[in-house]
């Protein structure tokens, strides 16, 4: 299976640079995964396609302000007690990728040439000091931090949101890169399908008798890593940490046993429950790391339907949705979305891949 099979032409102006003021006011393309039929709506109309007994699976990870801007410092002979460092002034950017024990983080450091083992970096005039202690897979650096106080509070003060590479400017309100149900800190990128939900919409859905289950997968920057290999089977997926609690696994399994559909909000929720599923198709209470790569030919163990954003050409996320609805249906739907001027990627519009399109009058 070739990477080019998942190419579509996307005009640059359709890449959304800012979120809409109304989260649930984005557009929604509904795709019947069996027939390829497409209808157009406003996202809040998703309720038309949900029913009592369905289970909506959310990823409640929380994006941390993982982008740190600092300066390299060099050891100097102490000139006075307590003054053993001098700033060299070389700007260094750190992206926190994965937390390790003992205040150590796996990071991406720019510029990499300056990031040798032993390098020390000052953030916020010394409020936070990082020392590179090792070089690991893909050239990432392990950095040990020293500080006074609470790390999360310092990070909230000094850090910036690590927006996707196709977003060209900082957000005025960094909370718009969080879902309203974000809870467990650890992601370097948002599970963006969830950005369309408001608390009011979630309550409306729950009041319909739809079960809401929460899982956690901390999204890494690897989610933006392009597929470089021509044969997608040669691609190696990045690793991401996930957790499914027993109470949430029970909600999903009970809904499945009762004949309800399992509807994931986002590809991260999908990858989580598929990673935690046993051979009988039931979700286990489990935590660990997953490198699951879902592409056409994959047989879903748990998932029935998917709410997702529009993804990059030739990306692993586009391959995942093609596994659910077929490459032909997905590419055709994407081409129609381009024609209809949908907004793409993280701050863009949404798609609901379902199996029971009901005839409704198009909103547009």
Swiss-Prot record:
It catalyses: 7-aminomethyl-7-carbaguanosine(34) in tRNA + S-adenosyl-L-methionine = epoxyqueuosine(34) in tRNA + adenine + L-methionine + 2 H(+). InterPro entries: QueA, QueA_dom1, QueA_dom2, QueA_sf. It is found in: Cytoplasm. Its EC number is 2.4.99.17. Pfam families: Queuosine_synth. GO terms for molecular function: S-adenosylmethionine:tRNA ribosyltransferase-isomerase activity. Keywords: Cytoplasm, Queuosine biosynthesis, S-adenosyl-L-methionine, Transferase. GO terms for cellular component: cytoplasm. The keyword Ribosomal protein does not apply. It is an enzyme of class 2 (transferase). It comes from the Bacteria. GO terms for biological process: queuosine biosynthetic process; tRNA wobble guanine modification. Pathway: tRNA modification; tRNA-queuosine biosynthesis. PANTHER family: S-ADENOSYLMETHIONINE:TRNA RIBOSYLTRANSFERASE-ISOMERASE. NCBIfam families: PRK00147.1, queA. Transfers and isomerizes the ribose moiety from AdoMet to the 7-aminomethyl group of 7-deazaguanine (preQ1-tRNA) to give epoxyqueuosine (oQ-tRNA). Belongs to the QueA family. This is S-adenosylmethionine:tRNA ribosyltransferase-isomerase. It comes from Lachnoclostridium phytofermentans (strain ATCC 700394 / DSM 18823 / ISDg) (Clostridium phytofermentans). The lineage of its organism: Bacteria, Bacillati, Bacillota, Clostridia, Lachnospirales.
């Amino acid at each position: 299976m070739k990477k080019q099979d998942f190419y579509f032409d996307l005009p640059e102006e359709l890449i959304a640079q800012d979120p809409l003021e109304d989260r649930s006011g984005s557009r929604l393309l509904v795709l019947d995964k069996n027939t390829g039929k497409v209808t157009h709506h406003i996202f809040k109309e998703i309720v038309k396609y949900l029913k009592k007994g369905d289970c909506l699976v959310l990823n409640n990870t929380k994006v941390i302000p993982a982008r740190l801007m600092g300066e390299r410092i060099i050891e100097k002979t102490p000139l006075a007690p307590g003054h053993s460092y001098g700033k060299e002034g070389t700007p260094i950017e750190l992206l926190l990728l994965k937390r390790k024990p003992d205040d150590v983080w796996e990071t991406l450091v720019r510029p990499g040439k300056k990031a040798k083992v032993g390098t020390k970096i000052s953030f916020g005039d010394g409020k936070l000091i990082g020392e590179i202690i090792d070089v690991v897979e893909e050239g990432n650096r392990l950095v040990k931090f020293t500080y006074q106080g609470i790390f999360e509070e310092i990070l909230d003060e000094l850090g910036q949101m690590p927006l996707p590479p196709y977003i060209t400017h900082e957000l005025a309100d960094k909370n718009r890169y969080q879902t309203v149900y974000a809870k467990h800190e650890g992601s370097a990128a948002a599970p963006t399908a969830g950005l369309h939900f408001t608390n009011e919409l979630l309550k409306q859905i729950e009041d319909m008798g739809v079960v809401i289950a929460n899982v956690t997968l901390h999204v890494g920057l690897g989610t933006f890593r392009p597929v470089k290999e021509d044969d997608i089977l040669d691609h190696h997926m990045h690793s991401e940490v996930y957790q499914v609690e027993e109470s949430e696994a029970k909600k999903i399994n009970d809904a499945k046993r009762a004949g309800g559909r399992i509807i994931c909000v986002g590809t991260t929720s999908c990858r989580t429950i598929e990673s935690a599923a046993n051979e009988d198709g039931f979700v286990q209470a489990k935590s660990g790391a997953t490198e699951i790569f879902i592409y056409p030919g994959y047989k879903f163990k748990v998932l029935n339907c998917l709410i997702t954003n529009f993804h990059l050409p030739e990306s692993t996320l586009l391959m995942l949705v093609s596994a659910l609805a077929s490459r032909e249906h997905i590419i055709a739907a994407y081409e129609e979305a381009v024609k209809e001027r949908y907004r793409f990627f993280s701050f863009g519009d949404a798609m609901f891949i379902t199996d029971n399109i009901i005839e409704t009058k198009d909103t547009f």
